[in-house]
Each structure stands twice: as C-alpha cells, then as structure tokens.
Amino acid sequence: MKAREVEFEGHLIDSMIFTKALDIILDLDGEFEILEFRVGKKKDDPSYARMIVFGRDDAHLEQILKELHKIGARIPDIEEVELAEAPADKVLPDGFYVTTNHPTFVRYGGEWLPVEDISMDRVIVIRDGRAYCIPIDEVVRGDRVVVGEKGVRVVPPERPRKSTVFEFMGGRVSSERPTERMIEAIAREIYELKLKGGKIAVVAGPAVDHTSARNALAALIRDGYVDLLLSGNALAVHDIEISIFGTSLGMDICKGRPVPGGNRHHLYTISKVIAAGGIKKAIEKGIIKDGIMYECVKNNVPFILAGSIRDDGPLPEVITDVMVAKKKMKEALRGINMVIMLATMLHSIAVGNLLPSYVKTICVDMNPSTVTKLMDRGTHQAIGVVTDVGLFLPLLYLKIKEIEAKE
Amino acid sequence: MKAREVEFEGHLIDSMIFTKALDIILDLDGEFEILEFRVGKKKDDPSYARMIVFGRDDAHLEQILKELHKIGARIPDIEEVELAEAPADKVLPDGFYVTTNHPTFVRYGGEWLPVEDISMDRVIVIRDGRAYCIPIDEVVRGDRVVVGEKGVRVVPPERPRKSTVFEFMGGRVSSERPTERMIEAIAREIYELKLKGGKIAVVAGPAVDHTSARNALAALIRDGYVDLLLSGNALAVHDIEISIFGTSLGMDICKGRPVPGGNRHHLYTISKVIAAGGIKKAIEKGIIKDGIMYECVKNNVPFILAGSIRDDGPLPEVITDVMVAKKKMKEALRGINMVIMLATMLHSIAVGNLLPSYVKTICVDMNPSTVTKLMDRGTHQAIGVVTDVGLFLPLLYLKIKEIEAKE
Amino acid sequence: MKAREVEFEGHLIDSMIFTKALDIILDLDGEFEILEFRVGKKKDDPSYARMIVFGRDDAHLEQILKELHKIGARIPDIEEVELAEAPADKVLPDGFYVTTNHPTFVRYGGEWLPVEDISMDRVIVIRDGRAYCIPIDEVVRGDRVVVGEKGVRVVPPERPRKSTVFEFMGGRVSSERPTERMIEAIAREIYELKLKGGKIAVVAGPAVDHTSARNALAALIRDGYVDLLLSGNALAVHDIEISIFGTSLGMDICKGRPVPGGNRHHLYTISKVIAAGGIKKAIEKGIIKDGIMYECVKNNVPFILAGSIRDDGPLPEVITDVMVAKKKMKEALRGINMVIMLATMLHSIAVGNLLPSYVKTICVDMNPSTVTKLMDRGTHQAIGVVTDVGLFLPLLYLKIKEIEAKE
Amino acid sequence: MKAREVEFEGHLIDSMIFTKALDIILDLDGEFEILEFRVGKKKDDPSYARMIVFGRDDAHLEQILKELHKIGARIPDIEEVELAEAPADKVLPDGFYVTTNHPTFVRYGGEWLPVEDISMDRVIVIRDGRAYCIPIDEVVRGDRVVVGEKGVRVVPPERPRKSTVFEFMGGRVSSERPTERMIEAIAREIYELKLKGGKIAVVAGPAVDHTSARNALAALIRDGYVDLLLSGNALAVHDIEISIFGTSLGMDICKGRPVPGGNRHHLYTISKVIAAGGIKKAIEKGIIKDGIMYECVKNNVPFILAGSIRDDGPLPEVITDVMVAKKKMKEALRGINMVIMLATMLHSIAVGNLLPSYVKTICVDMNPSTVTKLMDRGTHQAIGVVTDVGLFLPLLYLKIKEIEAKE
C-alpha cells in the first residue's frame, strides 16, 4: 500500500471538484482518508481539503495522482517540472504530458510559469524560459518537453456566479427553452462584451447563406460586433453568388425558388473570383458589392477560410493545407473572448479544440446532437441553442439594435 | 394468359400516373400492350391511354387490376359496385374495399355516387342511397359494405399548376430553403385562403407554449385566422399556467429561467381549472386572462383536446376516450381547407389520417424526420418546413400583418 | 432576516446533494453558515452536515426550505405532516404537496409512514392510517391531502456503487459507446436480475415489428425474461399481420418488399381479430400462430395496450380511455424492477412518469434526442442506448443465450 | 415566338424523363406541341418522342433547351461542340459548360467523344483529340474548354430493371424497412459484384472504430471485399490506438469503459506512429498488429487519408492539402463499381461528388438527415440505410460469410 498527501483549494463543493476527486479515487479502486476539510462558511469563502490517497503500489498510486492532478489537486511538496528532449522533429519523449484546455502552470526554475496558448490535446515545451502549449507537429528536435504530471498545475475555471446567461445556462443545451428569450440574453452578452472592449469570433457554416441570415451577419460585421470570421470555401462562394447572381446554390433568394440554369452560378461565381485574383480584388473591382465577405474586407475584419475535400474551386483565399489553416486559426483566436458557432459541426469542433476553457462559446444548430457534441468540452462557459440559424441571426441583430437604442 | 382492357384519362404524364401504371404491371410480372396513347398537345389538354393488361391467370390479372384501380384506371365496361352485408357490429365481409384518401366514387344504381367523408384506411358503406366512408368501429350489423374494386373510381388530385407555394414545394420538405421566404409564402397562402372564405385548422403541440409563439398563436385566433384548434392536455395546461403563474413548466417565461417551486405550478394549474369546473368556466370567473385557450373561448373557435397516456390531470375538457376524440376530430375537420401542424407528431399523423388528399397541409417541426413522415401522404398538397416553431409563429404573424397592411 | 437550522445525512458529496443544497440557497439569494461538516473518512461512511439557512423574511426562508426539502434536507425538530381536506372530487386544498419520484415518508401519528405507489407529479393522501401517492383524478371529496413540506421526508437514491452498467453509464446516453459491448452488459444485467427473481417490463413501439426484432422479443417472452408488456394498438396489429399474412404494413417481411394489395392486410388483420372476438380468442381459434402477442397469451405474460388517436380499429383488447389505461399500467408496474423501453417516445415517457426513481430503466431508440428526453428523470438508474432496435433485440437475445450457456 | 424541334429516345415514361421534360417547359413558361409519341409496346421497347418547343424569344428558347439538354434531349441537326480558350490558369471562358454526373459525349470532329472521368460540377476540355472532365483548378492557360450546350449529349442512366436491391430501393432511404433484410440484400449485391470481378471502395468515418465493427471491416479487407479505403486521420488513429493500447479514445474496447489516463492514448498513438516513420513502417516494426490499417497494408489495399482541420497530429500518411487529397481520391476511384459509405458525412459527400452517376452507392448512417443528403445525387443507383454502423458491419460480414458458405 502506498500513500501520498494531496490538497485542494477553491470552491470545492460548489464546483463539484471534491465530488470528482472522490469519484476518481473510488473508480480506480483506491482508498482515501480525509485529514482536513474546511468548507467556506460564507458565499465567497474558498474551501480547503487535505487527504491521504492510497494505492496498491507505486504505479497504482501514480495513476490515481495523475487523474487527481487534472482536476486541480496539488501535491504539497513542490517539485520542478520534469523535462525530456524531443529526439527528432515531431517525435516526443516517452510519457509526455498531454494538455487540458484549462489554464495551466509549470514549476520551472523555482517559479510557476503560465503555459502560453493553452488548448487541449497538445504538449508543453520550455523555450527560452517560457512555457508554450504546441501541437505535436510543431515539436522540433531538441525541444524540452514536459513529461509526467510533476510540477504541473491545472486551474479549472470556477463556475460563473453573477447573473448572466452563461451562469444560468452554463454547459447546457436549450432545446426546451424559449428561443426568443435565449436570443435576447445572448444579444445582451454580446453587447456588454463589446462595451468592455471584448473580442468576438464567428464560426459560420454555409447554412448562414440565406437572405436574412446573411444580411444579418453582414450587418453585425459592419456594426463592429465581429472581430474574426472563421469559415470555409462554401460560405464564401454562396455569399458571393448572392451578390453577383442574386441566387444561392442556384435558387433565387428573393422568391426562394430555383432559377433556370442556376446550378451553374456556383461554378461561374468561383471562376469570376479566380479570374479577378481573389475575393479582395473582386471587391475592389466592384464585382462583389455586398454581403459577408464584402463587409469583412471593407471593415478590415480578418477572415480565415479553411479548405475541405468537399470544396469546388476553391477560391484563392482558401487555405488548402489544413495544418496551415489550423495554425492560422490558432493565432487569430489569441485574445478572442467569445466565439459564436453557427451551423457548422466541422469548423466548430476544430475551433473548440483550439480554445482555452475560459473563452465563452455560443453554439447554434438545428440538430440537437450537434449542439450536444459541441458543448462537451468540460466548461461552464458554453451555451447551446437548438434553433434555426436562418431565423436566429436576424432576430439576434434586431435584439442588439434594440439594446443599442435603449442605452 | 388472361387479358383485360383498361383506360386512363387526365394529366397522365405530368402526374406520373402512366409511369406508375407501367411500374405496377412490371413489378407484378404482368405484361401490357398499349393500344392507344394520346398526349395532350397543349398545356391544358388531358391525355388518354388505352392498353391491354395480361396476367398469368384470373387471380394474377385481378391482382394487377386492383393496383391499377387505385391510381385511377378504369375498366371500360361499367359495372355496379359489389356489396356484402356486415355479419355483426365492427365485423366486415371478406374482401372489403379499403379506402385511399383521394376523392372516390362508387357506381350504384347506375349512377356515380361520391363517397362522403373520404379518408384513408377506412371502408365504404351504402346507407339510404348514399355512400359513406367510415372507420371499422362504426360498422354496424347489416351495413352494406363495398367489397372488391368493381364499380369504384378513385380520382387522385392533379398536381397544382398555378404559381403557389404548394405548387412549388408540393410534397417536399424545406430543410435547405430560406426559412424566412417560406414563411412569407405561407403567410400569403393563409391570407388569400381566408379572403376567399376558406377555413383553417391548427394542430399544435406543447412546444408552442413559449411566450412569443403562444402570443402569436393567440393573436392569430383573435384575428380570425384559425377556425379550429386540435391539440391535447399539455398545450392547454402550459398555456393556462402562463396565464395564471407567468411560468411554463415552472420556468419564468420572461426571464427564461426556473422559478423556485415552479414545478408545482403545473399541477396547481390543473387543480385550479378542475376546481373552477373547466377551461370555459375558469375564463368566465377571470382565472384565465389571456392566451391560446382564452382566445378560442372568447372568439368561439372550437377546440378539441384529445387525451394521451402522458397526461396529468387531465383538464375537464380533455376527451379521454381516444376513439370518441377521433370521431369528434373527424367531424370538426369537415369543410376545413388547410391544416397547419405545429411541432406535434402524434396529433399531426392522427389528423393527417383523417383528411382527404386535397386539403392543404403545412407541417412545421425542428426534426426533419418528423416532417418527412408527416409529408408521406401521397399528396402534392403538403409542404414541410424544418424550423423552430418558437420563431416560426411570431414571424408568420408579422408577415400576415404586413400583407394585411399592404392590401 | 429569518434563520432556520437544517441537516443532511448520507453520501452527501458523492451524490452531489451538498453541492445542490448550496446552489439552491445561493440561487434563491439566501445565505448560509455551515455549523458542522463531517465527511465520511472511508468509502462507506455517510457524511453529515448541519447549517443555518438565512432568508429575508418568513416567506423567503420558507421558499428556500421547500427546495432544500426536495433534496433530502431535514429540519431537526420533527413536526407532524400537515393535512387538509379535499373540498370536492378531484379538487385539491391550497398549497398541496406535489410528489417527486423518490422514496418518500410522511410523519403521521408520531411515526414515519412510507408513501405507497410513489411516482412524480402526484399528491399524497392519508387513508386508514396509510399514506398513498395518487393522481389528481383519483382524489375524492374528504380525502386528507398533504399540504406544505412539513413532516415530509424525501430519500433520493444513492448513486450505485458496485460495478454494473448502471453504475458506469448511470444517467447517461451512449451514442459514442460501442453498441455491442453495451448490449452485452445489458444482457448480463437482465440475466442476473431474473436469477434473483426480479421482474422486467417491456415498453415497445411498432418499430419492433420487423422479422428479427419481433422474433427476438417473442423469444424473450417465451423464455421468461418478460413479466409485463406495455404497448399500443399498432404493435399488436403489425405483429398479428405478420402471423396471418406474412407482411408488416403490407411489406413481405422475408423479402423486405411490398406485396401487392398488402396495404389492405393492416385493416384485414384488425377485422379478423375483431370478428374472432379479440386477440386471445383469435389465438385459441388458431388464427394467430406466433409472435409477440401469441407468446404473451401462451405464457400468461400480462399485456396492456393503451389507445391513441392514431389507432385504426382498434383491436378489442385496446383500452381506449387513456386514464383507465394509465391506471392499469400503474397497477401492473407495481413490483417491477426493470423497464426496457424500445423505440416509443409516447409510451416510454408515460411509463417513466409512473415509476419510482429506483426502478432501473433501459431506453433504446435511434433518435438521440428521444433517448436524452427519456433519461431526464433525475435518476442514476437509467441508461440510454442510441441504436437501431431492429438489430438491438436479436443481438440482446443472442447475448443472453450465450450467458445462459456459459453459466 | 421562337420554336425548335427536339427529340427524346429511351425508356421515356418509365424513367420519368418525358414528365420532367414537360415540367421544365411549363416551369419556364414555355409552350410545346407534341408531334409524335411512340410508347414501346412491350417491356423492353424504347419509346420515342418528338416535339416543338416554343419560347418568347431566342434567349428564352435557349434557356429552355439548356435545361432539356441536361435530361437527354437531342436537337436533331447535329452540331459540333463549341470551344473557347482558357485565358489563364484556372480562369474559364464565359458561358463554360458545367458537367452533370451522367455519362456525357461531345460532338467533335464529326464524332461523338465520350467525356472521360465524368463527375458533377466540373468542366470539359479537349486535349489531343480526347474529351476530359476536370475541376476548375486543373484548367491551364490555353485549354480548349466546352462552352454552351451545343454538341453535348448527356445520357442519364435508365432505371435498373432486374430484381436487385438497387432496383427495389433505388434512390430511397430505408428508415422504416427491416434492417436485417436490407443487410442481407446488400451482402448479396457485394458478393455478386465481387464474383463478377467488380471493385468496391469503402468510405469510413471514425464511428466504425468500435470493436466489432472495426474487426468486421478488417475482415472484409482481409477477405478481399474491399479494393480501396477512403478516410481521414481519426479513423486511422483510433484503429491503431485499439491495436497498441486496446482502447478507443481512451475507452477499454472490451469492457466499454474509460481507462484511467486513456485520453492520452490518442496522442501517444500518433506520436508512436510518427516516430516509427508512418503507418506502414509501424506495421513492419510490429508496433501495429491488427485492425483496419493493418489489413490494408498487409493485403495491398490502397488507402487515402484526407486531412481536416479537426485532426490531431496528423499521421504521416495523411494528405494535409485537401486539393491534393481530392485529386488522389478521384484517380483512385477510377474503375470502382460500388462505394459503401459508413457514418461520415464529409467524406461521403466529397466522394459522391467525384463519382459518375452509374456507380452504385450504399450509405449507412444513424442520422436520417445525413442519409437523405447523401442520396440526393439524382441517381437510382444509391440506397440509404438508417442504422447503427456498429451493428451493421458485423452483421454484413456474417451475411456475406453465409452466402459464401452456401454457394
């Protein structure tokens, strides 16, 4: 039997961390004895717990401690982080540490270094005295990579307490809730975040490209509510097809019915943009006169269009190498405080994987399974709305305008 | 080898009836020889076809003719319908004819009698020289029931030709179409139907009971757009809970968050209405002050609430015997020209089964599979919209008001 | 400021009860001070907590205590339950207590009476010194009904600890899990429950009626694994249609393709069973020779077929009054230890509402949203499997047979 | 008023081509007069129709003819195809012809050239006297590109007539059909296609990677039923994780429950394969010992893993540039007779876009909307099965083995 003392501090009960700790120990067939347990007597007091954890042997104990570590357990005697060299590019030393999406610190040179660019399923390297969270494919030979859990501290975000829609809905999906009220609450969150100088990214799928939703997103960009647009080839092509031909995938967007020969508009649009030298040039030349991409370019809102194997064309601005696209997305997301995901599972999951746990996310999709999947990131900073994005966006824009008018 | 001559008349090619006829013959391993085929030379000319159908033997030929009959084939020498007596209540003679939902005529006494109250999966009886379509459980001993296909003529509706949303979308589901445009087109259909004195039934599930959608439906009733409401216990209870407590299933409908103890409101509502002696009395006594049921009662719009095994209570007006409820629904639907089905699969399918094929139906649901199922009634008079009914209804009301203002 | 002392005992942290208690107090803007908190030092030790709860005034404090009560809080000075008379049939006294689905006790005559037939959203009456949980419509004038929370004690079930699929999956949906492994685990649960003399009810929708699934369910009944079948008219009609005509809804069940004229089989089946005098008589007369209903009758497994407004016919055994059906279902479910819900949302939710929280439930449906909805009963005794019931049942039967052979 | 004579030949009525022709003319507000209409008198006789089509003016007539052309209309006086030079790489001449996925011929030098590599939404270029169907991004400066519809002939496939599952289910989705019978029919199709020397490609998503389904797919590859595997990084990583760690996304695949620290296995797997130099090398070195990728390599079945922005790693064999991946997929699909799509929307749609209309496709997914979307390719050569791929694959393998044993 091997034993080790661990301690926890924070809103232990409120955030269910202590419950999870006991669960982990029992699920792994470990034992525990609680030495001390101080619950905060008042609302804002932190709690503190100290316990001895028992394992069958060193390996078993180590396994338990690894899991406890991930939810914030501290092993009182502070040790330096353990490092090992990467033997080749993209090749990692044995037992390398895999990151969570929570804020993380490593004990290095007697100090707690914050890990920069934290996001999940990556590794930590120390370069020039700073700790970076990087994907496998950016590891270069000789990189000093963190191995094991020693000297690594994870700080899961506390549950939001003040009265916001995130606090109320945090981590849940609203398929039974009144959609219009949810949209009002989200409009308020967006408005207040922008008031405080926050930054918002929009991740959008091609379903956004029907008249009213497209116009609403274009208006949100024009009015300064969007700081970054992440999407793919299809969204841009459909958006530009509307501007050039007045059709979306060959359908007249005003009458909502197919235009004869309209299916060709899709490829004709791509060809026109390629001939012009890209989206920006096509806007300069007056070929594209309105819409989502137009407003991005005119208002200097950066956009990243990542390629997929479904793409026709693609448009010149599309980044066809997915690893390059992913890297650019990661960089562009730095400093973003909220991400609004609109009707795209692939892009939303990809972006979700690149975000730290404290970035607020709002996921909107008609399919409840998609929303549930997107929400499953172990964070209270996400809300899911199961609704029709084609009606959601115009209403969101209207609600924001109403709030603007009132304040 | 047995042969028989059959003939078809109408928009044969356009409505794919001729294609189906050949399909049926070949699927059943029959043979055919076309004797005459006149295609209408202009848009509105009917076509005419005459052919010999071959079967291996009498039974095989009969089988083929049975199927051809259902899509409108006529066997030129006109025979009287064949009748047989029901040996006991609810017991049918062998080989009884099963109805489709298309307009149907029977040759009786040398005349073509229209079959009254036609709807699918029922039987035809002749009473006092008139032909009625009735369900099995209404057959009484001695009823003269139609057996076989002889002397029965089915007239499937032609595809709508003029430029309406039914012609355009007829029989299809709009999950990829711009929702807002669809709603506009539906608003126009409703407006024009009412202008011409048409009658509209609404079939609604409890998902309608969130503030804006509920208010929109109540307003549509108040403004005379609804002639009949078909629903269940839950819709009425939630609607009344909002009126009495301001909550829906215990959630504050303005703030969209649960009210402490709110889960009790559901049963308290039921209890209050029972104590008052029913919905109508509760409105008279001023207990219920607004909402869907309130507007129905105040505007003399009939409603039928059919019971289900999920019901709490139920409210006194709920018909707990499903066969009684079904019979009342069938009667109330007589003369209805359009049915709007809102977020309820059980009630929508039940109502769909009671309708002739020429009644227009609009099905709205968030789940594409539900809409597809509801559409599957062999008619071009149905359109399906995959969207959030909570946003659909307020927008529909708005669009109708815009049309009213313009005209 | 008003204050009251409350206490909790049990696996407080493990079952998250303490977390919920603090949540409730803070959500309602109350305050608390923890007086004592003893965490069980070992796995099986219960925990104990005592705290003072503060409210703004009596009403506010009462509101908080009501909510705490529902999760098991005790107010140390024990008071008798408060009763009030029902002024008329189905009419309840003000402030009546609404039940949860957890085991509940009331303090009456100085003793703790267990509330019989507990299930959610009902009321408690005291009759002849015993406490009964009954629906509103069974309340009769003069019944002594529990009002308020005083003297009522709710005991939410502890989370299952031993290594079963319920412990592992408890309260979760398996859309990402290996279906075959899940089925194996469920087969073992069923086998072991029956070994111990447990009783199993099956709730089944008509989707079960395709060859292999129907045969598997019939075999499970024959082999004694089913003690009660709850379903509707459609399941029975399709099952019997297969036995009489070899078709299901007109499709040849061996070749999987429609049989000419097969759509009539549905009504012909109903007519034959009505003519025979019901399902049992039709089996006696040799009209029905195999299948689900056949095995129920032959093996004396009771079945309840509840009517719905979609029903054709219906068959004579169908209970067309939903309140009567519900009452019979409630009675039949007494003593059942596990309920398997197969591809039917309406019946599954109805049955779920009739069950105490400690009855194990297994929900199988292709639609993840349906499963999620069915699981949402505040219990760890439920598991959901998102899969095709047509493949699930044959495999389940196979796995049970493999376990039988091994043991 | 402008007029032009057109003619049609083939199974016009049976394939609904004539119906569609009339629809097109009427939808575009054109007029027609039928000059001749000969229906095949016997089952296998082709039909022939000749009609005059009227348009308001040249442009209108041209528009109608364009649409008629796409469904196979011939304009009797045969003209050479019209060509125009591409002014720059990836830049197309005005009015370029956009391909369908049906077999297509162009009239060039007095002869009908078959268009090679036909698939939808591409362009046709003439190079060295041969006609090629290529995507926009492969057009090079100076390419002679087909413009307009003149001299282009499209031959939509006739509906399958012999009694196969494709004939029966062609173009439809089986959510109400008995799954087990469908699987049997598909097993027979696969077996017979391989007997005749046909080639089968499998497109698979990561949901396949649960024990039984993975083992079944591996066995199908080993037994020679798969000639090409198209997938992404995730499928390969999970498959290899099972081989190395016995877990899939950190879950024990035998017990179906998470393994402590198992979430790391995902990245550890990627790292091990990168370190080995790729999948093939890792198999050679004995690191990977079984599974889908193992069988591909051991049995020389080519595989293409296309990258996506969700990918971790990725594995060295993954093609991260989507346009390169797409081109390789197109090449590999040459000569494939059947494609089985398993639980992946992105890859299935991408592959569907690369296929000619006569390649048989079988789409399996749990989500009915996904299957419906995949089927929507205007072909009768597709069948969709809504079921659980985790149970589908083992059963499919079993059924194929049963057929093998019998024959």
UniProtKB/Swiss-Prot annotation, chains A, B, C, D:
NAD(+) binds at N233, A234, D312, T344, M345, L346, H347, D365, D388, V389. It comes from Archaeoglobus fulgidus (strain ATCC 49558 / DSM 4304 / JCM 9628 / NBRC 100126 / VC-16). InterPro entries: ArgZ/ArgE-like, ArgZ/ArgE-like_C_1st, ArgZ/ArgE-like_C_2nd, LOR/SDH_bifunc_enz_cons_dom. NCBIfam families: TIGR00300 family protein. It comes from the Archaea. Belongs to the AgrE/ArgZ ornithine cyclodeaminase family. Its cofactor is NAD(+). Its EC number is 4.3.1.12. This is Ornithine cyclodeaminase. Catalyzes the conversion of ornithine to proline, with the release of ammonia. Keywords: Lyase, NAD, Nucleotide-binding. It catalyses: L-ornithine = L-proline + NH4(+).
